Amino acid sequence: MVFHYPNGRAYDYHKNENHPSLVNKVNHRSINHNRSKTIYGNRGMSLEEEINESNQYYLSQGIAVIHKKPIPIQIVSVDYPKRSAAVIKEAYFKQASTTDYNGVYKGKYLDFEAKETTNISSFPLRNFHAHQVEHMRACQKQGGICFTIVKFTKTDELFILPADLLFKYWDEQDKSRKSIPKAEIEQLGYKLNYSISPRIPFLKGVDLLIANS
C-alpha cells in the first residue's frame, strides 16, 4: 500500500527507524530506584502495543484517560479480495501528524511520543520530525506535560525523555551532535521498569516530571 503526504510525495517507510509500515498501524533516575529490576514477559510486543495495554489498565482503574491519536489519512484506493475484508491500496496523509498519544492525568494534559532505537549508546534525533517537536513546544507553553517514552530495543531498557532535554539537543543539532547520548538520558530522564499491571508504569515517571516542572 502506498501512502502520500498532502503534497503528493510518497511516504518513506524507511526514513524513520521507529515507524513501521502504516499498513500495520491502520489495521539516571530509576523510578523504582533499582537498576536491576526483572523485565516481565515483554517479548513479542511492540512499544506501541505495550503502551496501549498500559493505557487500557490506567483507564480501567480510573487513574488516567490516555489514547493513541488516530492517523489523519484519506483513503483513495481500496481492493476487496474477499467480501469480509477490504485492503487499502493507496492513501494520503490529510495533514502532518503530531505526537502519538495524549490524555489527562491528575488534571494535567499529557502529550507524548513513543520511540524505539536499535542504537546502544545514543538516541538519534532523526526519529523526530520538526512538526512533532514544535507541537510539543506549543503544548508545553500552555502548561502541558510533554515527553517521549524511549526504548533501547537491544537492551530492553525504557526511559522517559523530558521534552526540555529533547529541545536542547534538537536546537543544537546543526552545530553539534545529531543524537542524544544514552548517558544523558540516564542522568536527566527517568528509567522505567517493566511490571505486570500496567506493563509499563510510565505514570510514575510523569509524577516526577510534574513534581519537577
Curated annotation (Swiss-Prot):
Top-level lineage group: Bacteria
Species per Swiss-Prot/TrEMBL record: Ligilactobacillus salivarius (strain UCC118) (Lactobacillus salivarius)
First-tier enzyme category under EC: hydrolase
Protein name, UniProt field: Holliday junction resolvase RecU
Cystines in this chain: none
Residues carrying the site annotation Transition state stabilizer: K115
SUPFAM superfamilies tied to this protein: Restriction endonuclease-like
Residues that, per the record, bind Mg(2+): T98, D100, E113, Q132
Compartments where found: Cytoplasm
